[in-house]
Structures are given as C-alpha cells and as structure tokens.
C-alpha cells in the first residue's frame, strides 16, 4: 500500500515559466485593468508633477531660489501682478537666483559683473525679452538677430543718432511738447484744479514724441492718438510667462496684444512707403525714416555708378542695402517698444520728483533760462541741450534713481557656464538685472537719495561699469545719447513754461511694475501756466 501510494504520479510545475518578474507583471496588469479613468489621470498627474519637480531641483543646483516649486505653474499668479518688493528680495537672495513658471526655467543675475557677462556673451545667449515677444514684435525683428545680420542692421541704424541727424528731429519734438503742455493745463482746468493722475498723458506725449521723431508728418494725429491709446495692450501681452497658446484665445492679453501690434505694423509700413515716395522727389530729411531712406538711396546710386564702370565715385558715409517697408516697420516698432514704457516711466518720475524737490527745479529753471538768454520761449536746439550740465545731471540721476529698464531677459542658446560652479541650462531664460548695479552703495553712496550733484561734484561719472541704464555689449541701446537730450529738451521747456504741484498720496512712493516702474497712484499732479 505504501509503495502504491508512493508510486502515484504528481502534477509537474513548469517553474521556469513563472519567474517572480512574470508574477509581478501579471499581477500589475490585472490591477491596471481594474483601474478607473480617474486613477489613470491621477497617476499621470503625479508622474508629471514629480518629473517637473525633479527637473527644477536639477536645474536649480546650488543657486538661490525656492527649495521646491509650486506644482507645475510655479509663481505664475505672482508674475501676473508683480510686486517690486519681490524683485528686491529676489536680487538680495544671491548673485544668481531662479524661479520656474510652467515649463520655463528662469535665472536672474543680480551681480553687476555677471550682468555684464550675459550682455557680452552672444555665443551663449540672445535677447528674447519674453517668450512671446517674437510673435508680437516680429520673428525677423533686428533685435533678435545675431552676428552678421544684426551688425548689418546696426551699421545702418547707428548714423540715425549722430548729432547731424538728431538736430533735425528737435523742431518736431518742440511742437509736440508745446501741444501737450497745453493739454496738461487744460486737463487740470477741466478737473477744477484738483489733482488727477497724469501717467496716462505722459504715456501719450512720449508716444507722440517717438512717432513724430520716427515718421514726422507721414503719420496722422489720429494714428498717433490711436497708437498711444492702444499700445499698452502690446506691452500688457509681454508678461514674463503666458499661459501656453493663449495668443490664439480671443480676449486674452496675448491675443489683444498681437492684434494691436499687427495694426501698428501696418501703419508703420504705410508710413515707410510714403517716405520713400517723398524722398524720391529730393526732399530734405526731417525724421528718422527720412534719414534711413536717404542713406538707402545714396547707397543705391553709388552701387549703380560703380557697376556702370565709373571711376572715382565718392563713397557715401553709410553704405547700406535696401530695406523693405516691412523691415522698416518691424525695426521702428522695436524702437517704439523699447522707448514707450521706458520714456513714460522716466517722464512720470521726473515730473513727480521735481515737484517734490523745488530746490532742484529752481536750479534747473535758472540754467535753462540762462541758456536761452532770458527768452523762456526760445526753442531748444542741440548746442543748447549739450550746454546744460545741471539739467544733464538731473536726467542722469533720475535714470539711476528710477531706472526705466530694471532687467533685460535673454535666452540661453546653449549651456552657459556663467560661473565656474553653475551652468545655465539650454533654453532657460537668463535675466541680467540693471537695478542692483544702479543702487550699489559702493558706487553711489546713499543710493536711495535723489542727488543730482553726485554727477557734478561726486564721482558718479566714473562708475561706468555700474551704469547699466542702456545695457552693454553688442545689443546695447542705440539711443543712449538721444534719450537724455530728448528728456532735457522736454523738462527744460516745461520748467520755463509751466508750474505743477504734486499731491502725494499714501501710494505715491509705492512702485508699480508694468514693464517698468511707475508710481502706484499714477502721479497726482495739477498743471498751470
């Protein structure tokens, strides 16, 4: 019996077919098959959040910044309504710091020398302003070009800001100032002499000054008013980070900004065509586009004569290629973008601070009256504007104290070893900051005090590495001489022809960040003759 029992055959298991790995896979598959759609969604979301968090920590490495990122969106809500104090805290956190908003990793360089390194490293970084900027300004806009293509544009544009050229822009600027100063007084009278915000009118006068300088009388007053009213929509669209694809959603800031930009581009192209037709008749240049088109015509005639075999042909001072109406439009649109908010900010603070500092305004007034030999209605010209040391000091101190450009976003086109210990990842934004260098107490003692004399009796003029108002490197501002002279013309004329009183509020010194810096209360003033 025992032997029979022992001889009964038993089923044989194929052990090789059931490894632990296969048991696990089979069990997992059965588990997944039982999952609901919500379980799949939650698992995918957790995986995405984990990946996003790990990538942030890896990109951050050793630089300052939050230890962890708010899942996916990062500080997006704060970016929609930026606080200036938050920027100060970020800059103070370290020479390099970072944030990550949605998919975009952003590195801020607050150290002066690191800012210079970014500005002067075109092989590693290119200007991007914000990710959506190319859609608004134009993908082929010259500010985004590098190397030979950028140099070609710059060579053609630089002569537009020589003394000879700038002298021809001033009569139109004088007329714009006279027109808008009357509007300032009328606006105060219409408000029964009560204070009102003037930031809006300051934006309008600066838009008019820019457009008349760019296009002279080729652009109508209605178009000037329309662009001045609408251009803030283009600025509002250029937030540091936008919701993906929002440019295609009607009613969003990027959608409205794109439509505004397209309309301005079309108007500028029309003005360029009108200019070419007018200059072909032999007219004298009176605005930027006139000078640019004249240089094209001179270059074309030169090339034609050389090609015809003429010898001893005099070469023009600025030999350039023919630029299309669209190229002219895109270029002058970038000029307007660069100038509109920056000049509006500078003008707003200048009028507010001078009203608060009657001692400064009195000295500025005396200097401008003396330069006009006692005739306060004498039009300004270039030699006059270049002979106003105190007015120049006031302008420079204003640009340092309340810089109209606080940083300039760049895009890392390849891994950028910005320090020996940190490399900015490719496709990250790297933002050199200008404000910290301009408020460095080692370069400018008591940097929060508005003190024009630091440019006369102090050594502020020697702090050239800290003077980042107009950037540095191959993409620095072409108008670094034009801007202070234009501001001097406007404020000198205002000082002699107007009185204005600032009515401070609890928010007058609170800084609003809208592309640049503005007083939070809009600058409450009353103007009179």
Curated annotation (Swiss-Prot):
Positions annotated to bind heme: 477
Pathway: Secondary metabolite biosynthesis; terpenoid biosynthesis
PANTHER family: C-22 STEROL DESATURASE ERG5, CYTOCHROME P450 26
EC assignment: 1.-.-.-
Mode of membrane association: Single-pass membrane protein
Gene it is expressed from: oblE
Protein's organism: Emericella variicolor
Similarity comment text for this entry: Belongs to the cytochrome P450 family.
Taxonomic lineage: Eukaryota, Fungi, Dikarya, Ascomycota, Pezizomycotina
Keywords assigned: Heme, Iron, Membrane, Metal-binding, Monooxygenase, Oxidoreductase, Transmembrane, Transmembrane helix
Gene Ontology CC terms: membrane
GO BP terms: sterol metabolic process; terpenoid biosynthetic process
Role played: Cytochrome P450 monooxygenase; part of the gene cluster that mediates the biosynthesis of the sesterterpenes ophiobolins, fungal phytotoxins with potential anti-cancer activities. The first step of the pathway is performed by the sesterterpene synthase oblA that possesses both prenyl transferase and terpene cyclase activity, converting isopentenyl diphosphate and dimethylallyl diphosphate into geranylfarnesyl diphosphate (GFPP) and further converting GFPP into ophiobolin F, respectively. Other sesterterpenoids (C(25) terpenoids) are found as minor products of oblA.
Organism superkingdom: Eukaryota
Protein name: Cytochrome P450 monooxygenase oblE
